[in-house]
Amino acid sequence: MYSENPIKRRASTRIYVGDVPIGDGAPIAVQSMTNTLTTDVDATVAQIRALENVGADIVRVSVPTMDAAEAFKLIKQQSNIPLIADIHFDYRIALKVAEYGVDCLRINPGNIGNEERIRSVVECARDKNIPIRIGINGGSLEKDLMDKYKEPTPEALLESAMRHVDILDRLNFDQFKVSVKASDVFLAVEAYRLLAKQIVQPLHLGITEAGGARSGSVKSAVGLGMLLAEGIGDTLRVSLAADPVEEIKVGFDILKSLRIRSRGINFIACPSCSRQEFDVISTVNELERRLEDIVTPMDVSIIGCVVNGPGEALVSDIGLTGGARKSGYFDDGVRQKERFDNDNIVDSLEAKIRAKASIINGRIPAQDINK
């Protein structure tokens, strides 16, 4: 597979969220946010584990009350991946979750009280080596900025972000990342472009309130893809009105499409037409379902006829080209003598893909796959 990647990442400082490096060339981290009641510890822990199982690097948890902070303590004790506490208005909640081992605080320094309260949170974060995310959102800009700009604009988002950055700068705190999210793609993209020129800290990307699973995925892919292709972004969240697990899957698919970071199988499949020799759509859907557990990066082409099939197979780890009654099978671009019965394609291909993943991971000798 042609894999030249012309993207030059924006230079930034590095912070750590738990043991996950962010910025300075580190792999772009994919995160999501729980949508359970935080006080429902069992449900929240279960969702965090589900997110971990599909590859989430970091999970954010809303902590709106002191009761939620006490629940967070229990949640943190049962979680294996770094957790960010999302906090607004009450600085005491930030101090409390810091005691309980939070890995990052998502706050806006300007909305948690006066300078003394801000200082107490920042000093606590410094003492406990906890980074902060400044999270600016087009839907919650300060009143004076709305009066000045009349509506959310890239310049308004930038000005809001720089206010909060300046607060941390005055307190000599540099362990932070920043986001300037908006629900409009062009608004968010331009705000991030402006911010990327102003600061050296890592940037967390997101198109906020993007929509449902389909429309939100498309909007996020367009917006985040534009920024990532320009080298902007160190961590991301795809915000969907859907199961948070889908956010992680879409996030990795975006990174995979740009060949920035790969996890699991990259399926190359034709949309099918009357030339197809087997049911391509049902085959791909079933294989995606069966092979969700595979994290090994690999390219698998599934093409229903010989027009494009051999060409795609030549640049795939595993390739399938439709043929009458039996379909051709390629391994590392080499056509194999073995052919698959079209009535048993899914089972046959699943076995080959799993064997290939084991070879790539070094668990079985290469010659064993085609015996």
Swiss-Prot record:
Cystine pairs annotated here are: none
Its UniProt pathway annotation is: Isoprenoid biosynthesis; isopentenyl diphosphate biosynthesis via DXP pathway; isopentenyl diphosphate from 1-deoxy-D-xylulose 5-phosphate: step 5/6
Positions contributing to [4Fe-4S] cluster binding: 270, 273, 305, 312
Cofactor: binding comment: Binds 1 [4Fe-4S] cluster.
Report the record's Gene Ontology biological process terms: isopentenyl diphosphate biosynthetic process, methylerythritol 4-phosphate pathway; terpenoid biosynthetic process
The top EC class, named as a word, is oxidoreductase
As recorded in UniProt, its EC number(s) are 1.17.7.3
**Keyword Isomerase listed:** no
Name used for this protein in its record: 4-hydroxy-3-methylbut-2-en-1-yl diphosphate synthase (flavodoxin)
Q: Which organism is it from?
A: Shewanella sediminis (strain HAW-EB3)
